[in-house]
A protein has these predicted regions:
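A structural signal for small-residue-enriched, beta-sheet-centric alpha/beta enzyme cores
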Residues: 1-245
Length: 245
């Protein structure tokens, strides 16, 4: 009886905990000439780390797909999105990303080809928008940080290195204090165990006075690359988690 067009907005708000704003995203695509959509709602601001964390995400599509194609699409979509964000490096036991399809758009069942590619692109776009909202809403965060690592031996090592920097308390507090201490980035990369020659590293960072901070590292060891998103570590984060129960 509570179903309505505005129900999705109420659902966004109902699942919030320490979030400061509700999170929703929608993307559209075409299936055999018919308009279809992917819509998602999520919550999460703290205990956010790869392999998810204390976050909930519910994604819906009115396209028709079977369990196999849905699972494959979701696995692909979360890899560069939800599994490449971290607020504090802490995970929880109650994380979830759920994808449901009802076929209500009236097009035929999608199993592959161009329509499946279009669906996968729309799904990843929704996952990315929701994931980045979580980082921007990180508990106590004053900065949104993008860490791009290129030139690694492979993509896995690039992601490992980027995550090591993103989860470094020394790096995160330096960004909060607008302190360009790049030694903390190099130290985090070295401690991550990935292979590179420190003498070949190239490092660039945007202004730390801005809300959005971009960090770029080239390791000079190969062609692997990854991007991880995080936030700074502030006194407000400590206050929130010291008082939360």
């Amino acid at each position: 009886s509570s179903l309505s067009v505005s129900g999705i907005q109420r659902a966004q708000k109902a699942i919030m905990t320490t979030d400061t704003f509700s999170k929703g995203a929608t993307a559209f695509f075409s299936v055999s000439g018919r308009k279809a959509s992917v819509c998602g709602v999520a919550k999460g601001a703290g205990m956010i780390a790869p392999d998810m964390a204390t976050m909930l995400c519910f994604i819906f599509t009115d396209a028709a797909l079977g369990p196999g194609p849905l699972q494959a699409a979701l696995k692909k979509a979360v890899a560069p999105t939800f599994n490449c964000i971290t607020v504090d490096g802490c995970m929880s036991t109650n994380d979830n990303v759920i994808l449901l399809a009802n076929g209500a758009c009236g097009a035929g069942k999608i199993s592959g080809g161009k329509d499946y590619s279009s669906f996968c692109s729309a799904l990843e776009a929704v996952c990315r928008e929701l994931a980045l909202m979580m980082v921007r809403d990180g508990e106590g965060a004053s900065k949104f940080i993008s860490i791009s690592v290129e030139g690694a031996l492979n993509d896995r090592q690039a992601r490992t290195g980027a995550l090591a920097v993103a989860n470094s308390n020394l790096f995160k507090t330096a960004v909060y204090g607008e302190n360009r201490n790049f030694g903390r980035i190099i130290a985090a990369l070295g401690a991550s165990g990935i292979k590179f020659d420190p003498g070949k590293i190239r490092l660039k960072a945007g202004s730390l006075k801005r809300r959005d901070v971009d960090v770029y590292v080239h390791l000079g060891a190969g062609r692997g690359k990854a991007v991880v998103y995080t936030s700074d570590l502030t006194p407000e984060y400590i206050k929130i988690n010291a008082e939360y129960s």
